[in-house]
Amino acid sequence: MGRIVVAPLPKIAELAVRHGCREMVSLVAPRQDFHRPAVISAGRHLILGVNDIAFAGTGKLVAPGEEHVAAILAFARGWDRQAPLLVHCQMGVSRSPAAALLIALAVEPDQDDHALALRLRQASVQATPNARLVEIGDRVLDRGGRLVAAVRTIGRGADYVGDSPFVFSAAPERGGP
């Protein structure tokens, strides 16, 4: 099936249960405390301590790095896609949508980057994928700048108006983009 549930931190328990998620990627501030939903397997929970910033060198903040992208991609490649994968950050707007794009490309590498970005925008008007995660992912996945260009094409999402989780398919629909 290959569905990715993208959520803000306050909604993870509710959405994990509602969608039957058993695995989760958490992109949260370093040392941020939160409880893993009981339905999520401890062995299939990736926690990355990374701030939502687009460049390094901002004091004590941790910028997304190649090691974070490598961990996301390795985790994605271990996802059996039998149940939806829950991906979250604090607000569900920047880090987690960027990770969802990278996960989709890790499990379905032959898909079109532009069509993928359009699917993301159709799923969420608020999503504004973290530029640094996208840029590093583009390079590591050898996309040749196509993912970066596709995300630039969809532009910044709508202003944040509250928690707006969404479900995003890792693969294009048959006969669609």
Regions from the language model: what does each represent?
Residues M1-I40:
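Glycine-rich, flexible N-terminal cofactor/catalytic loop recognition
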Residues V28-A29, V50, M91:
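Glycine-rich His-Gly loop
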Residues F34-D52:
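A short, gly/pro- and small-residue-rich
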Residues L46-L85:
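Helix-loop module immediately N-terminal to the HCX5R catalytic loop
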Residues R77-V107:
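Catalytic cysteine-centered active loop of the rhodanese-like fold, especially the PTP/DSP P-loop
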Residues W79-P84, L105-P177:
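PTP/DSP superfamily signal
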